[in-house]
Amino acid sequence: MTSEIILQAIVTGLMMGLIYALIAAGLSLIFGLMEIVNFAHGEHLMLSMFSSFWLWSLFGLDPIFSIPITILLMAFCGIITHYFLIRYILKAKMLIQICATFGLSIFIRSIAQLLWTPDFRNVDKPLLEGRLEIGSVFIGQPQLVASLVCLVAFIGLYLFVTKTETGLALQATAQDRHAAEILGIPSNKMFAIGWAIGLGCVGIAGGMMANYFFIFTDVGINFALFAFVAVALGGFGSIIGCLYAGVIIGLVESLGGLLIDPSFKLLYVFAIYLLVVIYRPQGLFGRY
């Protein structure tokens, strides 16, 4: 095995890791804010990919140009999810919250299968296609642009949460919602904003991946699983931890499949998850 092949795997892992990081950041933001795990995160990613596909199929809008629309659609979906479901289970037991979001995932997937069937779809001849050759490394243009857009979005999210007034209000609500309400911060509004931003993240990731991934009703399952691992690895509620965790997962998946056995790629990732849960349950970075 040559060093060029290993370098190719590293580059591929880094690009996928940045996408995993943004997906996980949306999940982590929601959990850190409300301590509710969104088990429908993968289905929301699937909806974002289908949104890009149908905007291309019906209106000829290339996925890279439909990203703003996809973000708005998914943010609206997050607000609807909060006001019509989540706010009613905020004070419920954890088991009820898990069943509610898990049931939401089944509902969304079932509706998608009814409307669109489980067939595989793809965007034919997108604006981004082809590959770049840098030395001995080949980089697909759609993958490169998707990873860079996700990185920029991640940085924007982190700066928003840590530097803006609304972001600081989100952090205050996450730390102590009752104290935040005493200070005049409307927790219900913050929760809705958190859901909008969290699903906006999957809107960006899903919209970019629609350029080169097959789109089908179960497409979000593996991405959601990796997002859960990234959140656990980086620290529940830690946004910056998702970046490092996403990159680690991408590299483990890529290098593990190359150096050991590609059929066990998922095993390597979940082995890391188990080790983290057992030996460092708070994750590498803790909250925020």
Placement of each model-derived feature along the sequence:
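Transmembrane helix-bundle core of multi-pass membrane transporters
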Residues: 59, 88-163, 190-193, 255, ...
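Alpha-helical transmembrane segments within multi-pass membrane transporters and channels
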Residues: 60-104, 111, 244-249, 280-281
